[in-house]
A protein has these predicted regions:
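Predominantly a Rossmann-like dinucleotide-binding segment in NAD(P)-dependent oxidoreductases
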Residues: 1-122, 221, 256
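C-terminal helical cap and adjacent loop that interface with cofactors, partners, or active-site loops
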Residues: 131-279
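Contiguous C-terminal substrate-recognition/catalytic subdomains in enzyme active sites
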Residues: 94-95, 99-148, 153-157
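A short glycine-threonine-serine/GTX helix/turn-capping micro-motif
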Residues: 37-43, 124, 204-212
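Residue-level detector of functional hotspots within protein domains
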Residues: 17, 27, 33, 47-50, ...
């Protein structure tokens, strides 16, 4: 729909991602909670979202201005412990996680704690948590498109909302990954024309992981002669640019200033996204 010009030229994008109190909290139990290990969720998690944005917009990110804070996890808890198995507050902690109910995790993680000290059921309220749990950014692309992005890590549901604003209309989607409101087997797009009626478009769920993307990715890698009509095959450059948006966001928060992607590495943002299929 976007490439077909249904909403004209894209001028801006609204993109908001929600991690629920299970998936989102899990990053604060594990090594991801330390910015020196994960680079923060700007890099470890949001880079996947920026990769999507770069592909959808078909241009390279040029500059980033960001805000972020730690409002819910870490030091904000009223009680804490080293990990859930040793915690005296399990009866009143809504984030209590009983790893002993998962034998695979007991064998993989708990049995090896004596070697590396890694706690898979770490407390989400540990004082050493130093990553953000609330983030927002304004991203400007080389072709002039502006993006308003946010990531919340303690939402009651999982999924994302996205809207593309164009010169001829608007395309919206609400992808409910934890399906809190219905039992339907499809995602729905809504196409608004500036001077016309709205259209509802149903997209059936994919049968493999990540919305059906896992099967497509494996086919691209392992099956010879697979075509790539939508230019979904990503290069090292694509991966670097996705990470660089997160790094720029982190630097922007630290300095209080917008950060240009070109100032971070030798990669120069292009108005038209480069397509490099290397298999």
């Amino acid at each position: 729909l976007r490439r077909a010009g249904e909403i004209g030229d894209i001028t801006s994008v609204d993109f908001h991602w929600y991690l629920d109190t299970s998936h989102g909290a899990d990053y604060f139990r594990r090594w991801h909670r330390l910015v020196e290990c994960s680079g923060s969720l700007w890099v470890h998690k949001a880079s996947h979202h920026f990769d999507l944005l770069n592909w959808w917009i078909d241009s390279d990110p040029e500059s980033v201005y960001a805000l972020g804070s730690l409002d819910h996890y870490g030091k904000n808890g009223t009680f804490r412990a080293e990990n859930c198995r040793t915690c005296p507050h399990t009866s009143k902690c809504k984030f209590y996680y009983d790893i002993t109910r998962n034998q695979n995790y007991m064998d993989l993680y708990v049995a090896n704690e004596k070697y590396d000290g890694y706690l898979r059921d770490g407390c989400v309220f540990k004082n050493d948590v130093n990553i953000f749990d609330k983030m927002a950014a304004t991203i400007r692309y080389k072709n002039g498109v502006q993006v308003a992005y946010s990531l919340t890590t303690y939402s009651p549901y999982e999924g994302y909302r996205i809207a593309f604003n164009g010169t001829k209309g608007r395309l919206e989607a609400w992808i409910q990954e934890s399906r809190p409101t219905s039992d339907v087997n499809f995602d729905e797009l809504v196409l608004f024309k500036n001077f016309g009626k709205r259209e509802y478009i149903q997209i059936p769920f994919g049968t493999s992981g990540h919305g059906g993307g896992d099967a497509l990715l494996k086919d691209q890698i392992f099956l010879p002669g697979i075509k790539d009509p939508y230019k979904q095959c990503a290069s090292v450059r694509d991966g670097a640019l996705a990470c660089l948006v997160g790094i720029a966001a982190r630097n922007s928060i630290a300095t209080g200033q917008p950060v240009k992607i070109a100032d971070l590495t030798s990669i120069q943002p292009q108005e038209k996204k480069l397509y490099q299929r290397i298999l």
